[in-house]
Design a protein with these regions (language model features):
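FIC/Doc superfamily catalytic core
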Residues: 1-315
């Protein structure tokens, strides 16, 4: 590979998906990123961690990852637990990585694999074969990665395309002795996050996990074809699905919040905002947004003052 753009074609599918992603991002941003509540943010991060690990055969799953994040002890092999801890630490620094700096990618690999590999953070020194794919010789890896990052830094491609192209080229080079899949997916997220921080909230890796066979087939198809096009199309589809999933989850979460607030008001018409916050584990601003929405929809009304009044349910 040289500094030229890796080979790919702009297909009608790529154009359509790019447009759809832009439209869905606008929907997500229209309400503000704060609309995605902290619980959903945490849930999506856990989905991301579980997804990227399960693709590599670590099936500790969302429940145990949640427990680990909460500081609880869980059962698992030393390697499984080390992989989870490494993934948690690597993704915690998502906002700090510079997408076009090779040293930052090496740092990410060091963090991810530190308890697993003695060579964590260093390129492989041996030749490897992945399935039917014979990766470039170990002696070529450093130059190939320098060139890939030079292209990443200097090319004019849209960041959506850059993220997909980088992901495939990285997997093709296979620069590390282990952890390539996890780093490839992480770095696509880093590139997307640098384009728009809202991408850090999306569980794209968990969607890829659900389409794991298609993921590997897209890599194989691109390798056979000698260009990135099949993989770009596949990953754009995964990004689109992850945005749609988040929109639906957030809408469902907000609907549930509305119903919970309403149920508590029906149970106790004199319930205060503070009591609602306590019972539902929501912030004051979150409760006030729900109340405003219910008022705007003419479902509730406040009779009297906040101190001595009560809620009137109109439905």
């Amino acid at each position: 590979m040289n500094n030229n753009t890796p080979p790919y074609k702009i297909t009608s599918k790529i154009l359509k998906l790019s447009t759809q992603i832009s439209e869905e991002l606008t929907k997500l941003q229209f309400t503000g990123t704060q609309k995605i509540n902290p619980m959903l943010r945490k849930k999506n991060r856990i989905k991301t961690l579980a997804g990227t690990l399960e693709i590599e055969g670590n099936f500790l799953g969302e429940e145990k990852i949640t427990a680990i994040l909460d500081g609880k002890r869980v059962l698992g092999t030393v390697k499984e637990l080390a992989e989870v801890q490494g993934a948690i630490k690597a993704y915690e620094k998502l906002d700090n990585y510079r997408f076009d700096e090779l040293d930052d990618l090496l740092l990410a690999h060091k963090i991810l694999m530190d308890e697993i590999l003695t060579t964590a953070g260093s390129f492989r020194s041996v030749n490897v074969k992945v399935g039917e794919h014979i990766a470039p010789k170990a002696s070529m890896v450093n130059e190939l990665m320098i060139n890939l990052f030079s292209w990443l830094k200097n090319s004019d491609e849209h960041m959506l395309l850059k993220s997909c192209i980088f992901h495939y080229e990285f997997e093709f080079i296979h620069p590390f002795s282990d952890g390539n899949g996890r780093i490839g997916r992480l770095w696509q997220s880093v590139i997307l996050n640098s384009f728009n921080p809202i991408f850090s909230l999306l569980p794209t890796e968990s969607i890829v996990r659900d389409y794991q066979e298609e993921y590997y087939k897209a890599i194989e198809d691109s390798t056979e074809l000698g260009e990135n096009t099949p993989f770009i199309e596949f990953m754009l589809e995964m990004i689109f699905k992850s945005i749609q999933t988040t929109l639906k989850s957030d809408q469902k979460s907000n609907y549930k919040s509305d119903q919970k607030v309403l149920a508590l008001m029906k149970e106790n018409s004199k319930i205060t905002i503070y009591e609602l916050m306590e019972k539902l584990s929501m912030s004051e601003s979150g409760i006030k947004k729900v109340i405003k929405k219910l008022k705007d929809e003419n479902i509730i009304n406040r009779v009297g003052s906040l101190k001595s009044g009560h809620w009137e349910i109109k439905e």
